Amino acid sequence: GKGLDWFKKQWGKLKNSFKKVGAKVKAAFNKGRDFLKKKGIKVDPLNCQGSKCRSCLIFTLKPKKFCVEYAFSASAITISLTKEKDDEAKVLLGPFTIKTGNIPQCSKLGSFIGELCLQGVEGRLKSSNGKPHVNLCVGLLLKKFGCGAKICVSYVDGKFSGSFKPKLFAGDEENGTIMEAGDKEDEGKVIDAVPE
């Protein structure tokens, strides 16, 4: 709607700018781009009930399915990760809470997934009528595959107002933050709270 268009313009202010990356990150980005090109991973839309949301990552080549549950609150996100197999869910990680803006928390999750890094990011805007508008995003990075997903929800005036389509990106982790690849192969940016 019209409100969303206004925010899309405003989000420009929350976007981090792209900068040149070193050889290690560039190699990870290229690996991630190849994996995404092969459609090696898909991410389900967020399914939210109140401020609890769930989304699944599907590895299409294997096939394997991992689901992530998020409970969002104003400044923190509680996350748990389950592996879905034969209609049975096995908890791999969590539930644990991450604060926005902290360095990524990385955990080794067995030989298939490898290392998973999670980072919370938040972006704050005032809406045209002065109400606080907050985007909360979780960056999930699969280091072994060089790619990740960004899952974002928004709060308006302290109330949960909805979720965005998850975004897949080629990425890596460097200097204590998750990096998102740009269009040029040697460019990346620190993950931001802009949903697309």
Swiss-Prot record:
Protein function: Probable insecticidal toxin that has been detected in a semi-pure insecticidal fraction.
GO MF: toxin activity
Protein name, as recorded: Venom platylysin
UniProt-annotated location(s): Secreted
Main subcellular location of this protein, as a coarse class: secreted
Residues that span the membrane, as ranges: none
Organism ancestry: Eukaryota, Metazoa, Ecdysozoa, Arthropoda, Hexapoda
Iron recorded as keyword: no
UniProt family annotation: Belongs to the redulysin-like family.
Tissue specificity statement from the Swiss-Prot or TrEMBL entry: Expressed by the venom gland.
Keyword Secreted among record annotations: yes
